[in-house]
Amino acid sequence: MKTSSLRGRGGAGFPTGLKWSFMPRQFPGQKYLVCNTDEGEPGTFKDRDIIRYNPHALIEGMAIGAYAMGITVGYNYIHGEIWADYDRFEEAIDEARAAGMLGDRILGTDFSFSAARIPWLRRLHLRRRDCPVGVTGRQKKGQPRFKPPFPASFGLYGKPTTINNTETFAAVPFVLNMGGEKYAALGKPNNGGTKIFFDVGRRCQARQL
């Protein structure tokens, strides 16, 4: 993941491999993986469309991340205005379980991972990716908080937690399929891979970023 130069696709652009390395390897208790599909920015629907049209890329990316960090439980935090896509994500989870890609002893290995969506809440614009942890796990208001502690040491239910955006997790299977170096070559220096953009409203021209 570090070789791929994949950065978080939720806005902050933090290096994904570096973030994953913060998860304590020898922690004796439960650890959690959280996907942030709240997507509250106006005119942004990329995460919704990933769940709608390619949910298995997201689920596979979460499972790969969980395997890399030794995590067995994951949640997808989805905001409450895309009810139809809840059902699509649940269907994809059931399909992945039936195919042996989720649940106990995935593909006959010793690795087990379960994923579920967090029950819907009214829509919030989550400016910090650890806000879903605050809203759902600590029963507090969804607002930025002083750090430390960081989610990797004190996150969901007070346990080590890694949080990534939907698009970030959906890119992970492509990193493994292509290899880190080839994936990195698709993007800019220190910012590998491709990026999804939504073009909305009235526009006159597009320019290269």
Write out the residue ranges for each language-model feature.
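Short internal beta-strands
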Residues: V73-G80
